[in-house]
Amino acid sequence: MLWEPELAPTEALFQEAVEHVARKLGRAKEYPTAPLPDDRAAAVLALDTWAGSDVDWRGELRRYYEEHIPVRVRPGAAVNATLRRLHTSGVRLVWASPGPAEATEVLLHHLGVARLIDEVVIATSASGAASSLGLTDAVLVENGLDELLALAGEAAVPT
Protein backbone atom coordinates (compact mmCIF):
# COMPACT_ATOMS: atom_id res chain seq x y z
CA MET A 1 0.00 0.00 0.00
CA LEU A 2 1.70 3.16 -1.24
CA TRP A 3 0.66 6.44 0.40
CA GLU A 4 0.66 9.28 -2.13
CA PRO A 5 1.42 12.25 0.15
CA GLU A 6 4.77 10.71 1.09
CA LEU A 7 5.86 9.44 -2.31
CA ALA A 8 4.55 12.32 -4.43
CA PRO A 9 3.54 15.30 -2.28
CA THR A 10 0.79 17.25 -4.03
CA GLU A 11 -0.82 19.23 -1.21
CA ALA A 12 0.42 22.60 -2.51
CA LEU A 13 -0.72 21.72 -6.03
CA PHE A 14 -4.13 20.70 -4.73
CA GLN A 15 -4.50 23.99 -2.85
CA GLU A 16 -3.50 25.97 -5.96
CA ALA A 17 -5.94 23.97 -8.08
CA VAL A 18 -8.79 24.61 -5.64
CA GLU A 19 -8.02 28.35 -5.70
CA HIS A 20 -8.12 28.21 -9.52
CA VAL A 21 -11.44 26.34 -9.45
CA ALA A 22 -12.89 28.92 -7.05
CA ARG A 23 -11.78 31.82 -9.28
CA LYS A 24 -12.94 30.25 -12.53
CA LEU A 25 -16.13 28.47 -11.54
CA GLY A 26 -17.01 30.91 -8.78
CA ARG A 27 -18.28 33.21 -11.53
CA ALA A 28 -20.84 30.57 -12.57
CA LYS A 29 -21.83 29.57 -9.05
CA GLU A 30 -20.99 31.62 -5.98
CA TYR A 31 -18.10 30.02 -4.11
CA PRO A 32 -18.53 29.78 -0.31
CA THR A 33 -16.57 32.25 1.80
CA ALA A 34 -15.86 29.71 4.55
CA PRO A 35 -12.46 28.04 4.18
CA LEU A 36 -12.34 24.40 3.13
CA PRO A 37 -11.46 21.78 5.74
CA ASP A 38 -7.75 20.98 6.08
CA ASP A 39 -8.43 17.29 5.54
CA ARG A 40 -8.39 16.70 1.78
CA ALA A 41 -11.17 14.10 1.80
CA ALA A 42 -13.40 16.53 3.69
CA ALA A 43 -12.41 19.32 1.29
CA VAL A 44 -13.38 17.15 -1.69
CA LEU A 45 -16.75 16.44 -0.07
CA ALA A 46 -17.26 20.17 0.56
CA LEU A 47 -16.42 20.93 -3.08
CA ASP A 48 -18.87 18.26 -4.27
CA THR A 49 -21.56 19.77 -2.05
CA TRP A 50 -20.85 23.28 -3.34
CA ALA A 51 -20.78 22.29 -7.02
CA GLY A 52 -23.75 19.94 -7.04
CA SER A 53 -24.63 19.39 -10.69
CA ASP A 54 -24.19 23.09 -11.52
CA VAL A 55 -20.44 23.20 -12.22
CA ASP A 56 -17.80 20.57 -13.05
CA TRP A 57 -15.16 21.35 -10.45
CA ARG A 58 -13.53 17.93 -10.84
CA GLY A 59 -13.04 18.43 -14.58
CA GLU A 60 -11.58 21.88 -14.02
CA LEU A 61 -9.29 20.55 -11.29
CA ARG A 62 -8.12 17.79 -13.63
CA ARG A 63 -7.30 20.34 -16.36
CA TYR A 64 -5.37 22.42 -13.83
CA TYR A 65 -3.37 19.37 -12.76
CA GLU A 66 -2.61 18.44 -16.36
CA GLU A 67 -1.24 21.92 -17.04
CA HIS A 68 0.67 22.47 -13.80
CA ILE A 69 1.85 19.10 -12.53
CA PRO A 70 5.09 19.10 -14.59
CA VAL A 71 6.23 22.20 -12.69
CA ARG A 72 5.21 21.00 -9.22
CA VAL A 73 5.99 17.26 -9.22
CA ARG A 74 9.02 15.52 -10.68
CA PRO A 75 9.09 11.77 -11.34
CA GLY A 76 11.63 10.03 -9.12
CA ALA A 77 13.91 7.52 -10.82
CA ALA A 78 14.40 5.54 -7.60
CA VAL A 79 10.65 5.33 -6.96
CA ASN A 80 9.91 4.29 -10.55
CA ALA A 81 12.66 1.68 -10.68
CA THR A 82 11.64 0.23 -7.33
CA LEU A 83 7.97 0.05 -8.31
CA ARG A 84 8.93 -1.66 -11.59
CA ARG A 85 10.98 -4.27 -9.71
CA LEU A 86 8.21 -4.91 -7.20
CA HIS A 87 5.59 -5.15 -9.96
CA THR A 88 7.77 -7.53 -11.99
CA SER A 89 8.30 -9.74 -8.94
CA GLY A 90 4.53 -10.09 -8.53
CA VAL A 91 3.92 -7.71 -5.64
CA ARG A 92 0.41 -6.23 -5.76
CA LEU A 93 0.81 -2.46 -5.73
CA VAL A 94 -2.05 -0.40 -4.34
CA TRP A 95 -1.80 3.40 -4.47
CA ALA A 96 -3.68 5.16 -1.68
CA SER A 97 -4.50 8.81 -2.17
CA PRO A 98 -6.50 11.46 -0.36
CA GLY A 99 -7.97 12.21 -3.79
CA PRO A 100 -9.79 13.26 -5.72
CA ALA A 101 -9.52 10.41 -8.21
CA GLU A 102 -9.16 12.78 -11.17
CA ALA A 103 -6.05 14.35 -9.66
CA THR A 104 -4.58 10.98 -8.72
CA GLU A 105 -5.01 9.66 -12.26
CA VAL A 106 -3.14 12.64 -13.71
CA LEU A 107 -0.40 12.25 -11.08
CA LEU A 108 0.17 8.54 -11.73
CA HIS A 109 0.42 9.10 -15.48
CA HIS A 110 2.82 12.00 -14.98
CA LEU A 111 5.00 9.89 -12.69
CA GLY A 112 5.05 7.11 -15.29
CA VAL A 113 3.72 4.48 -12.88
CA ALA A 114 0.04 4.22 -13.85
CA ARG A 115 0.52 0.83 -15.55
CA LEU A 116 2.42 -0.56 -12.56
CA ILE A 117 -0.31 0.17 -10.03
CA ASP A 118 -2.85 -2.62 -9.61
CA GLU A 119 -5.44 -0.55 -7.78
CA VAL A 120 -6.04 3.02 -6.65
CA VAL A 121 -7.96 3.71 -3.46
CA ILE A 122 -9.13 7.12 -2.32
CA ALA A 123 -8.91 7.24 1.48
CA THR A 124 -7.86 9.48 4.34
CA SER A 125 -4.84 7.29 5.17
CA ALA A 126 -2.93 4.27 3.88
CA SER A 127 -4.21 2.17 6.77
CA GLY A 128 -7.76 3.32 6.01
CA ALA A 129 -7.30 2.28 2.39
CA ALA A 130 -5.98 -1.13 3.43
CA SER A 131 -8.95 -1.61 5.77
CA SER A 132 -11.43 -0.64 3.05
CA LEU A 133 -9.96 -3.38 0.85
CA GLY A 134 -9.88 -5.92 3.67
CA LEU A 135 -6.09 -6.17 3.47
CA THR A 136 -5.03 -7.21 6.95
CA ASP A 137 -1.47 -8.16 5.99
CA ALA A 138 -0.68 -5.24 3.67
CA VAL A 139 2.71 -3.57 3.96
CA LEU A 140 2.10 0.16 4.29
CA VAL A 141 4.59 2.56 2.74
CA GLU A 142 3.64 5.72 4.62
CA ASN A 143 7.00 7.37 5.23
CA GLY A 144 8.57 7.96 1.85
CA LEU A 145 11.31 6.61 -0.34
CA ASP A 146 13.43 4.91 2.32
CA GLU A 147 10.48 2.79 3.40
CA LEU A 148 9.73 1.87 -0.22
CA LEU A 149 13.35 0.92 -0.82
CA ALA A 150 13.39 -1.16 2.37
CA LEU A 151 10.32 -3.02 1.11
CA ALA A 152 12.23 -3.86 -2.05
CA GLY A 153 15.35 -4.80 -0.08
CA GLU A 154 17.40 -1.90 -1.40
CA ALA A 155 19.27 0.99 0.14
CA ALA A 156 18.91 4.64 -0.73
CA VAL A 157 21.81 6.07 -2.67
CA PRO A 158 22.60 9.69 -1.85
CA THR A 159 22.51 11.97 -4.88
Regions found by a protein language model. Give the residues of each.
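Small/polar loops that bind or transfer phosphate-bearing groups
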Residues: 10, 95-96
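Asp-based, Mg2+/Mn2+-dependent phosphohydrolase catalytic module
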Residues: 101, 105-159
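Residues within well-ordered alpha helices
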Residues: 21, 46-47, 85, 107, ...
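Anion (oxyanion) recognition and catalysis
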Residues: 23, 87, 153-156
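Short beta->alpha linker loops
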Residues: 13, 74-78, 99-100, 125, ...
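Short, acidic loop-to-helix structural element flanking the phosphoryl-transfer center
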Residues: 66-95, 101-105
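N-terminal helical cap/lid subdomain that shapes the substrate entry/recognition surface
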Residues: 1-77
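Short glycine/proline-centered loop/turn elements that form peptide/ligand docking sites
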Residues: 53-55, 80-85, 145-148
